[in-house]
UniProtKB/Swiss-Prot annotation:
Binds 1 zinc ion per subunit. This is Glycerol-1-phosphate dehydrogenase [NAD(P)+]. It catalyses: sn-glycerol 1-phosphate + NAD(+) = dihydroxyacetone phosphate + NADH + H(+); sn-glycerol 1-phosphate + NADP(+) = dihydroxyacetone phosphate + NADPH + H(+). Belongs to the glycerol-1-phosphate dehydrogenase family. GO terms for molecular function: glycerol-1-phosphate dehydrogenase (NAD+) activity; glycerol-1-phosphate dehydrogenase (NADP+) activity; metal ion binding. Substrate binds at residues 120, 167, 251. Its EC number is 1.1.1.261. GO terms for biological process: glycerophospholipid metabolic process; phospholipid biosynthetic process. Pathway: Membrane lipid metabolism; glycerophospholipid metabolism. It is found in: Cytoplasm. Keywords: Cytoplasm, Lipid biosynthesis, Lipid metabolism, Metal-binding, NAD, NADP, Oxidoreductase, Phospholipid biosynthesis, Phospholipid metabolism, Zinc. Zn(2+) binds at residues 167, 247, 263.
């Protein structure tokens, strides 16, 4: 059986806080609800979302600090203790991922209200949580609705929008890896999911100059691409259309660094290297990332070149069952260093 789950509503526009209650009503969600936010996103939109909901529904709130299993369990306890019927995540990737997994494990729906456009988790079924073995993608359920307020997202530092491009552009190498696994290992492959995923990547490449400006149109384009990417994963029933060797590289960096860079920044650099290994146009990918202001080197990422090399050599061990261009044995130190140097990453 192949189950596909999608958000029932995706709303993209301006000043959408007042629209939250209408979404709750249309989805026939009952009180009480739970607003999940971070210390920063509480001030950006969390408090105003809670205030708006409180006008018509019983609602509680909780602050989440990081994407860690301990925070997931904290949210689960709140859901259990207060008999919460649904949750709304107001924040970036970490807040959304924690809410996503806690809601899934508690058997309740959740709404995604992103405050940044930094990665495709805003609409996908997958969550990246630390503290569960290695930090990799954990299967949950997609949000029942996505409410993307351009005015809110536009207030985030430009770095986050550029990271969103880095996450979407990684679909290029992810789909290549997926095709490789299909050809060599007989893995299930969905042409439709792959096409939608690649369309998202092509869109940000085509519109890089607009996205660079960080205006309403640029933000809208990145959000649409991220949501399409999330939907592609739902169609595939896995993260395959948007997560290949470049994501394994990013997860390896997460393990090696005390303070990793943004997820999309790391996957963007990973995509440059993996595109080189695949023999495809890595220069165009690098040019796009430069255009939108995303880092394209270890120096710009603030990471020691030695860490980049080490991450490349251990990336294949992160998810051994996921076949990619790295193969079963991974890259030798020499091969990793060569790829990173040729592409200008180090």
């Amino acid at each position: 059986m192949h189950l596909m789950e999608f958000p029932r509503e995706v709303i993209l526009g301006k000043n959408l806080v007042p629209e939250v209650n209408n979404v709750i009503k249309r989805l026939k969600l009952e009180s009480p609800g739970l607003v999940v936010y971070g210390p920063v996103t509480k001030k950006i939109a969390g408090e105003s979302v809670k205030k708006a909901i409180r006008d018509e529904f019983d609602v509680y709130s909780i602050t989440v600090k990081k994407a860690h299993i301990g925070e997931v369990e904290k949210v689960e306890a709140k859901i259990r203790d207060y008999n919460i019927k649904w949750a709304i995540a107001v924040g970036g990737g970490s807040i959304i991922d924690v809410t996503k997994l806690a809601s899934y494990r508690s058997g309740i729906p959740f709404i995604s209200f992103p405050t940044t456009a930094s990665h495709d988790g805003i609409a996908s079924a997958n969550a990246s949580i630390r503290g569960i073995e290695a930090k990799t993608s954990i299967k949950a359920r997609p949000p029942i609705a996505v409410i993307a307020d351009i005015e809110v997202i536009k207030t985030a530092p430009r770095r986050y929008l550029a990271a969103g491009v880095g996450d979407v552009i990684s679909n290029i190498t992810a789909v290549r890896d997926w095709k490789l696994a299909h050809k060599l290992k007989g893995e299930y492959f969905s042409e439709y999911a792959a096409a939608l995923s690649l369309m998202s990547a092509k869109m940000v490449i085509r519109d890089a100059e607009i996205i660079r400006l960080g205006n309403d149109e640029g933000v809208r384009k990145v959000i649409k691409a991220l949501i399409s990417s999330g939907v592609a994963m739902s169609i595939a029933g896995s993260s395959r259309p948007a997560s290949g060797a470049e994501h394994l590289f990013s997860h390896a960096l997460d393990l090696l660094l005390d303070k990793p860079a943004l997820h999309g920044e790391q996957t963007g650099i990973g995509t440059i290297i993996m595109a080189y290994l695949h023999g495809i146009n890595w220069r165009k990918i690098k040019e796009t990332l430069k255009t939108v202001g995303a880092p394209t080197s270890a120096y710009e990422l603030g990471i020691d070149p030695e860490i980049i090399i080490e991450a490349l050599t251990i990336a294949h061990k992160i998810r051994p069952e996921r076949y990619t261009i790295l193969g079963k044995e991974g890259l030798t130190r020499e091969a990793a260093e060569k790829a990173a140097k040729i592409t200008g990453v180090i």
